[in-house]
Swiss-Prot record:
It holds the Pfam family Coiled. It comes from the Eukaryota. Belongs to the UPF0519 family. Residues 22-33 have a biased composition (Low complexity). It comes from Dictyostelium discoideum. This is UPF0519 protein C. Residues 18-37 are annotated as: Disordered.
């Protein structure tokens, strides 16, 4: 379960960094660039959710096998 917690923590840190990047860009960039950053953040979040799901499934499989 520590692997799952680690990945979850990484996701939160990554999302926090992306949010800060969006805040920084709001003051300097055009709305089109901000929208692009928001789309990238969504993609990163989706990939992290997918990795979390796969890791969770692997954790359950390992626990059920008893390795």
């Amino acid at each position: 379960m520590t692997i799952i917690n680690s990945i979850s923590s990484l996701g939160k840190i990554s999302n926090k960094n992306k949010s800060q990047a969006n805040l920084n860009s709001n003051s300097t960039n055009s709305p089109n660039n901000v929208q692009g950053l928001n789309q990238n953040t969504g993609l990163v979040s989706s990939l992290l959710e997918l990795v979390r799901g796969v890791t969770f499934a692997l954790g359950l499989a390992v626990e059920s096998v008893g390795l």
